[in-house]
């Protein structure tokens, strides 16, 4: 799917949500799908967009040797688990100082995405855990795929919904 096709698709999805009554999005956590962020801000201009931290970490660890993975992951965790954005910035600087000789693309990516990585710092720690990752929706989608894969067909919409206890 090209960037333009992705944007069109997400624009249609979000327009349908708005037409069905979703008048406002407060914050949206995205995983970097092409066109998604632009579609969100087009339909919901006041929405904050948060880049998924889990996806940032996974993408960062692609550069890392197996031997260094635990240490690099721990240093990245210090960034997103910081109490304040200022503390997170300091942890990112420490990360760069420690790892840039071996893994400069990691800190470069975090610096480039910083404005999209940090919106969740405006919220209390209890809320941050919910909004900094797309894991909740990915888990739901996985459950839906599993049920659909085993059943393949449903006699009615109600029968399908009953599978999900809705």
PLM features per residue range, with description:
Residues 1-30, 34, 38-46, 136:
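RNase H-like nuclease fold core
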Residues 2-6, 28, 49-52, 64-68, ...:
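A generic short alpha-helical patch detector that favors 3-5-residue windows
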Residues 4, 10, 18-19, 41, ...:
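A detector of single, family-specific signature residues
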Residues 14-19, 73, 105-108, 126:
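Generic detector of short, locally flexible boundary/turn motifs and exposed helical patches
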Residues 21, 25, 32, 44, ...:
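Short coil/turn residues that cap or connect secondary-structure elements
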Residues 27-34, 39-75:
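Conserved beta-strand -> loop -> alpha-helix junction used to position metal-binding or nucleic-acid-contacting
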Residues 78-166:
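Acidic/histidine-rich catalytic cores and adjacent linkers
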